[in-house]
Amino acid sequence: MIKFNIRGENVEVTDAIRAYVEDKIGKLDKYFNDGHEVTAYVNLKVYTEKRAKVEVTLPAKNVTLRAEDTSQDMYSSIDFVEEKLERQIRKYKTRMNRKPRNAVPTGQVFGDEFAPLDTTDEVAEDHVDIVRTKHVALKPMDAEEAVLQMDMLGHDFYVFTDADSNGTHVVYRRTDGRYGLIETE
């Protein structure tokens, strides 16, 4: 069963919007096994130019699904995000079935409610071509210093060792121009 955490920025999350989100995104519940509890983090934003942005993140075991859409109509953005998430689930399951690994089998996360996507036309798209490998020495520093290093290098992310916890972290530049921090466990 999917639980919902719905937030609104510059918009009141009315009962009608909440019901619509829960109905549309709730349809994805059929793709998850009964034993897995998933929380959908939904962020609804309205900008001054009357554009609506919908962001949905579904963290599941070994995979995090995320989709967003911006349009003039909040409801059509919700529809489009639901379609994107469904496609991600199907594509993920197809890839995992094609390349068996030591990871969790997809049947343990996603149920067998649907057939895998026919991706004969997308084989080239699925191929990952790593064109460069870098080896870096991680320096102990705090997040602020890592952001400064990232900016000096002109990169969108920077991997570093946190001086306090000794853990490997990543700072990154978000699409809104602010910064994010990923802390590994």
Curated annotation (Swiss-Prot):
Region: Probably still associates with ribosome, residue numbers: 1-125
One Pfam family, short name: Ribosomal_S30AE
GO cellular component, one term: cytosolic small ribosomal subunit
Record region (Required but not sufficient to restore ribosome dimerization, in vitro will replace E.coli RMF in ribosome dimerization): 126-185
Subcellular location as annotated: Cytoplasm
Effect of gene knockout: No visible effect on growth until cells have been starved for 5 days; cells recover from starvation less well than wild-type and are dead after 14 days starvation. No 100S ribosomes are formed even in stationary phase.
GO terms for biological process, alphabetical: negative regulation of translational elongation
InterPro entries: HPF/YfiA_ribosome-assoc (IPR050574), HPF_long/plastid (IPR034694), RHF-like (IPR036567), RHF/RaiA (IPR003489), Ribosom_S30AE_C (IPR032528), Ribosom_S30AE_C_sf (IPR038416)
UniProt keyword list: Cytoplasm, Translation regulation
Coiled coil: none
Any one Gene Ontology molecular-function term assigned to this protein's record: ribosomal small subunit binding
Function: Required for dimerization of active 70S ribosomes into 100S ribosomes in stationary phase; 100S ribosomes are translationally inactive and sometimes present during exponential growth. Able to dimerize E.coli 70S ribosomes in vitro.
Domain-related comment: The N-terminus (residues 1-126) is homologous to YaiA and HPF of E.coli and can associate with ribosomes, while the C-terminus (residues 126-185) seems to be a functional paralog of E.coli RMF.
Annotated family: Belongs to the HPF/YfiA ribosome-associated protein family. Long HPF subfamily.
Subunit structure comment from the entry: Interacts with 100S ribosomes in stationary phase; alters the relative position of the 30S and 50S subunits.
Family matches, as PANTHER family: 30S RIBOSOMAL PROTEIN
Name this polypeptide is given: Ribosome hibernation promotion factor
Organism whose genome encodes this protein: Lactococcus lactis subsp. cremoris (strain MG1363)
